[in-house]
Amino acid sequence: KTNTSYYFGTTKLSENYPQIAAFNAVITQELLIHKLSITDECIENLCVNKTKINVNQGFTRCSLIALPNNHFITSDKGIAAVLEKIHASVLYVDSFDIILPAQKHGLIGGCMAFFDGILWIIGSLHAFKEGEKILQFLKKINLPFIELYNGPLWDGGSLFFLQ
């Protein structure tokens, strides 16, 4: 047993877009970032007091990792442009060499998670062509990170931590 709260959404999931992406939002203390036209009603209701940021990418969480103090890393140029307009600190990286089985490549949000003040990474930034950019960004914002294995970045869809 955990003390983790959970909610049931109203969107009937399927393998088809946009239903498959209805829950793929990024939520911070202040923001809800998603393609708002497809966001599940439950998420909208839970985020009623947050600033809503609309992006064209339905797979927002797959493409974006939110870090403290309005810092973000994304593999989507459209998301980067929208966040820069609200004066967020955004690092864009190309996801061409992130592994996602059965797909051409993965996305940056799928191989990272932020929990308990630490950025957790599925793989090693040294094995990622744009890893040095991320290392410099993390150093600039003084953010610790843990690489979970010494190999290429692997898009596992994210990581979940239960307390």
Q: Language-model features: where?
A:
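The feature marks the mature, well-folded catalytic cores of soluble enzymes
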Residues: 1-163
